[in-house]
């Protein structure tokens, strides 16, 4: 395990997270018999938590990791009746690699075709806006103006918007940082023209750094889902997908977003 990855044992009790566990105890039905063997075959649920997306997870000054993804992992472990281990990583690409390599049982990912090899996805549980940030003096005023020759866009390597822009851009050039949290600082330091990222992260960066602004609107909608190693099979993927649908329908996902003060994300509609 690399220095950027840490593991935390999470005790499942109402004393640990009263609001989460109260919802878990009342809103979402138990999973079918055999679900624990399919989703947590080692007898513990290893959930990979990516800190690269602040809408889903954060670490506080004391080192405690919390967020919507942690709440969902806690709820799933409670429904399975197994202990929870959080495998914490700093970037989306690390999370993908961790689950593909079966070093975690589940993870939280933006759905993208390039990630489907090796990972089985649920339907999305939240929809997140991807946005652009520029310097105040930039001539850019609209998202449609970004994809032009000579425009350099800073992105987090392996992030959902990196994968999306790698497919969609016709003329602009991508520049990459190891993590999404470093995008705006590297954008400023290296003279890029645009920073791309999750709207909430860019809004937080704009609030603390002078001389930058967000372009209005969004350039993409990120579908955030749960996933597991594809080798677990279709039945395990269906169990995880069913859990996600229950969590959305019960109001659990909406309550978690509200509890963590998340803006720029909405609960995804029910899967058809």
Predicted features along the sequence, with ranges:
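N-terminal secretory signal peptides and thylakoid transit peptides that target proteins
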Residues: 2-16, 26
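Ligand-binding clefts/hinges and TM-proximal coupling segments of bilobed small-molecule sensing domains
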Residues: 27-32, 160-177, 214, 245-272
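Extracytoplasmic small-molecule ligand-binding "clamshell" domains
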Residues: 30-110, 247-250, 259
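Bilobed "Venus flytrap"/periplasmic-binding protein-like clamshell domains
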Residues: 46-54, 63-79, 111, 131-185, ...
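Periplasmic-binding protein-like
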Residues: 51, 127-137, 199, 203-245, ...
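Extended ligand-binding regions for polar small-molecule ligands
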Residues: 67-79, 138, 144-150, 158-159, ...
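Acidic, polar ligand-binding/catalytic clefts
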Residues: 74, 78, 83-147, 213-219
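A ligand-binding cleft/hinge motif common to bilobed small-molecule-binding domains
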Residues: 93, 110-118, 164-167, 188-220
